[in-house]
Amino acid sequence: MPIITLPDGNQRQFDNTTSIMEIAADIGPGLAKACIAGRVDGQLVDACDPIEKDANIAIITAKDDQGLEILRHSCAHLLGHAIKQLYPNAKMAIGPTIENGFYYDIDLDVTINDDELAKIAKRMNELVKTNYTVVKEKVSVEEAKALFKERGESYKLEILEGIHPDDRPGLYHHEEYIDMCRGPHVPVMKFCQYFKLMKVSGAYWRGNSDNKMLQRIYGTAWADKKQLNAYLKRLEEAAKRDHRKIGKQLDLYHMQEEAPGMVFWHSNGWTIYRELEKYVREQTEAYDYQEVKAPQILDRALWEKSGHWGKYKDNMFCTSSENRDYAIKPMNCPGHLQIFNQGLKSYRDLPLRMAEFGSCHRNEPSGSLHGLMRVRAFTQDDAHIFCTEEQILDEVSACIQMVFECYKTFGFDDIAVKLSTRPDQRVGDDATWDKAEAALANALTTNNINYGVLPGEGAFYGPKIEFTLYDCLGRGWQCGTIQLDFSMPGRLDASFVGEDNERHTPVMIHRAILGSLERFIGILTEEYAGVYPTWLSPKQVVVMNITDKQSAFVDEVVNKLKKSGIRAISDLRNEKIGFKIREHTLKRVPYLLVIGDQEVEAGEVAVRTRKGDDLGKFKVDDFAAYIKEEIITRR
């Protein structure tokens, strides 16, 4: 006779074994119709799973985040069901959920184009309308192997090879289609009606390029039509803001096959890059950092000693010379430790703050590369602080303050903070990790920062604070990090002389604000839709004549603005002024100056903004002062 405790503390007693669905029905028919799954003593379960003893339970509906995750996972099974009906020879690989949706990897001889995708979606809709019941079955590993061998599902068999023989995999029956999963899943298919198949791409089995290339079908799914339409609308807006599209329109950069994942910066894009670099440099100087520069290529022995070789060698570009192995740096910390190690350090030298615009390379899979957002060559606004344990709180607090100040400059005020704790693969003992995690948690609490915890997501050498920016479309971008490291300084022989005249190992704080300059420019481009604030705009002013008679004065104005440090250009083409204004507005130039005979006579410029506002006429020096103030204050 299990006693069930609900989230509000109310209890219900059942005569026999019960289930989440029976409990929902006991509460009310409306809840039973909405029930997707449940939690029993904190564990996710299917709505049909038996509950045989006293338990604390919660009923999950599509309104819950976990409910949305479950229905998306069930949509992946629905996709598999439709594919097997349409293409019986297809072999199904994996179908997990992802942010906002799901995908399924399929081994299929037929190339899935737009027409095939529409056919699959149509069959999925037909299956949903039948509202069939999903039946769960727990079997032995051997029974599962026999089933999938009979069905010719070689990828499922390979997955089963990695499952412990004593486990009992879950099989979910979608009528004649059977899929294998931990679950939970929706009880009936009506919950999966608000979906859309989005695209098809290639994906190597298990992400290994030595394996067969499969076809990956992506989809999105939501609790109701309103949510689905809102998401599709956001995608439309995101497509308009795509930094790759805007980058081409504004002539910022390009990428090409001869250098995959590496950016060719054009003059306009490089101007933005240098302005970001200038801004970060001002901040590091204000916070008393020393700027340094370490080599890009270091001996393999150093990477082995630091621990990076064992963790990252597959993602490192390597080379050799004169019988020595080298690697291009994927990160900057070992180089900064070598600088710290030059000369004897005293406790009086600490904290020592070291910053670098570090050029890094990582051998990311080619399929994961995406414009500026995922590259192989990038520059980190990296810094490392060497300090004593007693200085950790003050130094981490200063880093937190610096991060928030920088993000505010760019207009980001919706920032999520997470504390990432020890991963399974790590260096250092548990006592050291306990101390490091507690130190970061203390700094966050002291600074009144609300934060969540990401178990197991820390770096291999220490826990970290992660800062995720949310843009105007509600998308999250993880950028800044503050990582505490008690391990690497000791591994690389860093030490200082303490007040007791003994040698001690410093604590190392790894800190980045933008993350990588390339990716942050991509984020800003999409956030601003290319309408950068004046201080970041590649061209800040365009000066245009109405007729050839004003050309000399246009040149005079441009030269005067340039001498004031303003990025100004002229447009002396023999085109109508309206045409010029439209063209430079599309190029997102912040200020458009028009000069006719009256302006020449008065020594003035007529000022318009890219928004179409007419600011009236200014003396040239007055306009220069006006825009300079905007640039200096970074408004």
From Swiss-Prot:
Binding residues annotated for Zn(2+), in chain numbering: C333, H384, H510
InterPro entries: aa-tRNA-synt_IIb (IPR002314), aa-tRNA-synth_II (IPR006195), aa-tRNA-synth_II/BPL/LPL (IPR045864), Anticodon-bd (IPR004154), Anticodon-bd_dom_sf (IPR036621), Beta-grasp_dom_sf (IPR012675), TGS (IPR004095), TGS-like (IPR012676)
GO biological process, one term: threonyl-tRNA aminoacylation
EC number: 6.1.1.3
Key words, A-Z: Aminoacyl-tRNA synthetase, ATP-binding, Cytoplasm, Ligase, Metal-binding, Nucleotide-binding, Protein biosynthesis, RNA-binding, tRNA-binding, Zinc
HAMAP family in alphabetical order: Thr_tRNA_synth
Disulfide bonding pattern of the chain: none
NCBIfam families in the record: thrS
A GO cellular-component term linked to this record: cytosol
Top enzyme category: ligase
Cleavable signal peptide: none
Subcellular compartments: Cytoplasm
Subunit structure of this chain's protein: Homodimer.
Main location: cytoplasm
Cofactor needs: Zn(2+)
Xref: Gene3D superfamilies: 3.10.20.30, 3.30.54.20, Anticodon-binding domain, Bira Bifunctional Protein, Domain 2, Threonyl-trna Synthetase, Chain A, domain 2
Function per UniProt: Catalyzes the attachment of threonine to tRNA(Thr) in a two-step reaction: L-threonine is first activated by ATP to form Thr-AMP and then transferred to the acceptor end of tRNA(Thr). Also edits incorrectly charged L-seryl-tRNA(Thr).
One Pfam family hit: tRNA-synt_2b
GO molecular function terms listed in the Swiss-Prot or TrEMBL record: ATP binding; metal ion binding; threonine-tRNA ligase activity; tRNA binding
Cofactor binding note of this UniProt entry: Binds 1 zinc ion per subunit.
Protein name per the record: Threonine--tRNA ligase
Residue ranges, annotated region (Catalytic): 242-533
